[in-house]
Amino acid sequence: MNIIKKIEGEHLRFDLPKFKSGDTVKVHLRIVEGEKERIQVFQGNVIRIHRGTTGGTFTVRKVSDGVGVERVFPLHSPFIDRVEMVTEGRVRRSRLYYLRELKGKAARIKPKNRF
């Protein structure tokens, strides 16, 4: 069992910011096309986080041209260049699946009040 934890520990990333459900993030992905490499940015609301060792994931949702797009990212993926926090949201749930049914202004997440 210790051997597995040791191997998993080598692949963990500690450079990601602390974010939670409801936060708006920009995920910078490293895309390799043939011999070229480029960075693609995906910005949206975090609707789910599954924290685990190397199998942890988070789901980001955005609305593009009126169509909802959700993408699941592995937390410790080497293809994630960086994750930027845009805003912190104030929500009372850890899974924000109800946002899928809402449209327009109702689908907004209130910003967190900082005093």
Swiss-Prot record:
InterPro entries: Ribosomal_bL19, Ribosomal_bL19_CS, Ribosomal_bL19_sf, Translation_prot_SH3-like_sf
Entry superkingdom: Bacteria
Keywords annotated in UniProt: Ribonucleoprotein, Ribosomal protein
Pfam families: Ribosomal_L19 (PF01245)
Entry GO terms, CC: cytosolic large ribosomal subunit
One annotated GO biological process: translation
Sample GO molecular function, one term: structural constituent of ribosome
Record has Ribonucleoprotein as a keyword: yes
Family named by the database record: Belongs to the bacterial ribosomal protein bL19 family.
General function of this protein: This protein is located at the 30S-50S ribosomal subunit interface and may play a role in the structure and function of the aminoacyl-tRNA binding site.
Record NCBIfam families: rplS_bact
Protein name listed in UniProt: Large ribosomal subunit protein bL19
Biological source species: Nitratidesulfovibrio vulgaris (strain DSM 19637 / Miyazaki F) (Desulfovibrio vulgaris)
Gene: rplS
